[in-house]
Swiss-Prot record:
It comes from Leishmania donovani. Keywords: NAD. It holds the Pfam family DS. InterPro entries: Deoxyhypusine_synthase (IPR002773), Deoxyhypusine_synthase_sf (IPR036982), DHS-like_NAD/FAD-binding_dom (IPR029035). This is Inactive deoxyhypusine synthase. Gene3D superfamilies: Deoxyhypusine synthase.
């Protein structure tokens, strides 16, 4: 027969009285020293009031009878003291206001953006900045150039994020997030861009190919072509206003898009067209290397535009907006410590990084401060 195994004795439950007794023993030493159990658990409290602002948000009760403009300004001016990413947006807004409206005449302002910023409605915002000469240099990928020009020939429409890509493709519609671009827009762009390439190659031929053409020169030629051939729609274009106001536009990945396809196929029938991106690296560095003034940047999104700008231009102040995460381990998502470690930023660079969607937060940063909102933020 198997020997019977005694059942395990149930664990003794602590009573409330025993728990209180145990807690009393653990804090006894602190009580004998004249301190409380609370201080023993969390450490001595220090008051940071002298160096830190108090957290508070929007008092909507005081805005019940306010106008829409007054309410909007109250919301925006409350961002710095709201906490979390709202505070970052508020700090970024204050720095953007300084960069755009309170800089010295010798300072240079750079704006780097990803192509989706032009595909969406931020194109109108960038156009305003170029029209008012608030930015001295724009940097983007190929899509950030061609999508701007394409909108002069056809509209980009609002769709939905979940629309079936295969069904749209069969209908001749391209989808960028929840934005829809008909194929006809790209056909229009091909008809527009090919004569630009022909004029560029003719200039190279006239010089007996002693000079090469930089992407920024092709972009400038595109601005001139918009002004000449599409006067009714040119004023909506960032490329046009940069051409008209003499603002540099650089696209280091100029062939990574529809323009690259067209240059590729163009060279089958028109041999000898040379596009030299190194010319633009020299121009960008010369622009940033002036003896007087500071280099100031607004970086919307990451990837190539951010990396190309920051690796070539030593910055004095930078505002960054990104949806990337540090876990990605790429330049698009790098936190400030990563950018300093990689040499993209100097330790002394004044920097504000916002984790958020630029389509939402950047327009808020452009709302000008009044004397009242500045006083409210300071309080």
């Amino acid at each position: 027969m198997l020997a019977s195994v005694p059942a395990p004795r149930p664990a003794k439950k602590d009573s409330a009285a025993s728990r209180r007794k145990s807690a009393s023993k653990s804090t006894g030493a602190a009580v004998k020293d004249g301190s409380s159990a609370r201080v023993s658990a969390s450490g001595a409290a220090e008051s940071p009031k002298q160096s830190c602002a108090q957290v508070h948000g929007v008092d909507f009760q005081s805005l019940v009878h306010a106008t829409q403009e007054e309410t909007l300004r109250a919301v925006v001016s409350s961002l710095p003291t709201t906490g979390l990413q709202a505070t970052q947006i508020g700090r970024a807004r204050q720095l953007v206001q300084q960069i755009l409206h309170h800089r010295s005449p010798e300072d240079r302002v750079f704006l780097a953006y990803t192509s989706n910023m032009i595909s969406c409605g931020l194109r109108d915002t960038f156009t305003y900045l170029a029209r008012e000469r608030l930015v001295d240099c724009f940097i983007s990928s190929a899509g950030g150039i061609e999508e701007d020009v394409i909108k002069c020939g056809g509209s980009t429409l609002l769709g939905q994020f979940g629309q079936d890509g295969r069904a749209l493709r069969r209908r001749g519609i391209n989808r960028i997030g929840n934005l829809l671009v008909p194929n006809d827009n790209y056909c229009w762009f091909e008809d527009f861009f090919t004569p630009v390439l022909e004029s560029v190659q003719e200039a190279q031929r006239a010089s007996r190919w002693k000079t090469h053409t930089a992407p920024s020169e092709i972009i400038e030629a595109m601005g001139a072509a918009i002004a000449k051939n599409h006067p009714d729609t040119c004023t909506s274009s960032l490329v046009y206003w940069c051409y008209r106001n003499g603002i540099s536009v650089f696209s280091p990945a100029f062939t990574d898009g529809s323009m690259g396809d067209m240059i590729y196929f163009y060279n089958f029938s028109h041999k000898g067209l040379v596009v030299d991106p190194l010319e633009d690296v020299v121009r960008l560095r010369k622009l940033a290397a002036k003896e007087r003034g500071r280099n100031l940047a607004i970086v919307l999104g990451g990837g190539l535009p951010k990396h190309h700008l920051l690796r070539n231009v030593p910055m004095d102040a930078v505002v960054m907006v990104t949806t990337g995460l540090e876990a990605d381990g790429c330049v698009s998502s790098g936190v400030l410590a990563d950018d300093v470690a990689c040499g993209l930023l100097r330790e002394e660079t004044e920097t504000v990084r916002v984790q958020g969607d630029a389509t939402v937060v950047f327009p808020l940063m452009l709302i000008a401060e009044t004397a009242a909102t500045r006083e409210g933020a300071a309080a």
